């Protein structure tokens, strides 16, 4: 089996796989990279969340069948796609694995930790945020906020304008339907989370809450943050690549992985490691409070799940 895993990149809503090109150019000399083209961003309002998951699983399957392990890297909406696509590809806990490769890790970028059986918009009770609206006539989600402000406010104007020109349509069906195909794959593999402090699309406080929730629910989460917009793979590709190399080395859990991937020359001081410092009260508010809320949410979800299982057994 090849030693190095393949990276499978999943883009977010409205984005083509080419949004990762700059980042992939930095990574490909050391790791094989493939990017998923989401059917729900291909101009078909009938495309579904299941179609996106199937597209991601198809690429994962190609790699694992050839004996390669896989690390899934997903941005924004792509997080629920990437996490769901892990189903059936992680190593089994009882050791009865089939031959071939497996998904060995998940890296989320400005995204969230989804729940099994919960559609993308379910946590928002079906109400879209002010940044986009439901267009029932076309079947697409229409961006209302100026896209540069939403995604790329820290890019030079010319590059931001180009990136805006590359945005495409987003099927509503993927956002509101398909909950039966949503799967919390992040509970099956270790994960890394790359947060975005200056994000105007997904507030960093919400990101920190999501990390706290996942940890409370038993997930293994390494957390890093960058002082960027919603798209760090464009505004800070070298730092994003640095974190990815560090994560892959951890997923491989070997000296070989560390020697290959941790020698990247980048400025580590720009990478934030969120955590509490006893004599730095600001960290209590920046990190402690939102993560504590997340942990309470995670505990509530676990309690609800436990009561639901108990009720189901009692009603049989």
Write out the residue ranges for each language-model feature.
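Active-site catalytic motif of lipid deacylating hydrolases and related acyltransferases
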Residues: 2-68
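Active-site glycine-rich loops that stabilize anionic/oxyanionic intermediates
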Residues: 12-15, 76-77, 111-112
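Conserved alpha/beta-hydrolase fold motif
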Residues: 72-73, 106, 193
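Gly/Ala-rich beta-loop-alpha elbow adjacent to hydrolase catalytic centers
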Residues: 73-82
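Flexible "cap/lid" loop of the alpha/beta hydrolase fold
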Residues: 91-138, 143, 208-209, 257-275, ...
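Helix-rich cap/lid subdomain of alpha/beta-hydrolase
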Residues: 112-185
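Conserved serine/cysteine hydrolase catalytic core
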Residues: 171-233
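Catalytic active-site module of serine/aspartate enzymes centered on a nucleophile-bearing elbow/loop
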Residues: 218-316
